[in-house]
């Protein structure tokens, strides 16, 4: 597949087949994704990959966080129990859940921003490389990634680590329709040399 076709045809996949991908193939994709740009070759990406029975316990931690943060609409115990069952089914229906994180270096300063950007570049490389091999992904990033209890629950430290994303990966059961993008003409401006002076916004 050509790169243009790969970028345009990739979809966020919500439903997966149960089949697991070959681990060597996955490792190969990660090794290629690591050619993402990253300043000073810090290679800040770190991954935890949840599979098999670890998916349920990871899913439980995610749902605990959703409840803590008030992200679920209901507070009724029976409805919460049903929601938990639904999430458990979802977490077990996806072969791999990949938690991307990084070590903090300057407590939210520009180095951390650079590293965060590099991890995002890695993730998109991975999504496209996976798509080329017929593997679907879903990039998720909710407030949970900032939840200090959740960060500890996954064995990390809010002081030392920043969570970047959870990405689901597996062979797609259903490929959603394309979501068209807006034409870029509205979102960009060409700046001519004559316009450079007096540009500072109020
Ligand atoms: C930072 C980030 C967070 C996202 N979070 C979610 C999410 O929580 N749930 C979800 O279904 N998709 C999530 N997505 C995927 C987007 O919804 C998806 O890319 C968008 O709808 C366009 O669809 P497409 O990827 O199929 O083109 C996220 C994507 C990014 C980059």
Description of each model-found segment:
Residues 150-162:
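Short, electropositive alpha-helical surface patch
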Residues 95-97, 164:
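Structural motif
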Residues 5-12, 162-202:
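C-terminal helix-cap and adjacent tail motif
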Residues 37, 57, 105-107, 174-176, ...:
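Short, acidic Gly/Pro/Ser/Thr-rich loop/turn segments
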Residues 33, 98, 104-152:
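Small-aliphatic-rich amphipathic alpha-helix that forms the alpha element of a beta-alpha
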Residues 1-93, 199-202:
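N-terminal amphipathic, basic helical "cap/leader" segment at the start of enzyme domains
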Residues 49-51, 99, 168:
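Short, well-ordered beta-strand micro-motif
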């Amino acid at each position: 597949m050509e790169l243009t076709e790969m970028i345009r045809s990739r979809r966020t996949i919500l439903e997966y087949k149960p089949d697991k991908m070959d681990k060597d193939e996955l490792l190969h994709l990660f090794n290629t994704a690591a050619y993402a740009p990253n300043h000073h070759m810090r290679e800040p990406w770190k991954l935890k990959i949840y599979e098999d029975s670890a998916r349920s316990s990871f899913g439980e931690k995610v749902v605990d966080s959703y409840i803590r943060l008030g992200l679920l609409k209901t507070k009724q115990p029976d409805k919460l129990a049903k929601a938990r069952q639904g999430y458990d089914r979802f977490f077990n229906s996806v072969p791999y859940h990949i938690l991307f994180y990084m070590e903090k270096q300057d407590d939210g300063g520009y180095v951390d921003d650079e590293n965060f950007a590099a991890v995002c570049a890695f993730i998109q490389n991975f999504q496209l490389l996976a798509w080329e091999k017929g593997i679907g992904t879903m990039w998720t990033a909710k407030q949970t990634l900032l939840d200090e209890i959740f960060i500890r629950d996954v064995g990390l430290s809010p002081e030392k680590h920043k969570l970047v994303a959870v990405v689901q990966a597996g062979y797609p059961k259903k490929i959603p329709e394309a979501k068209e993008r807006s034409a870029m003409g509205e979102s960009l401006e060409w700046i001519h040399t004559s316009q450079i002076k007096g540009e500072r916004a109020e």
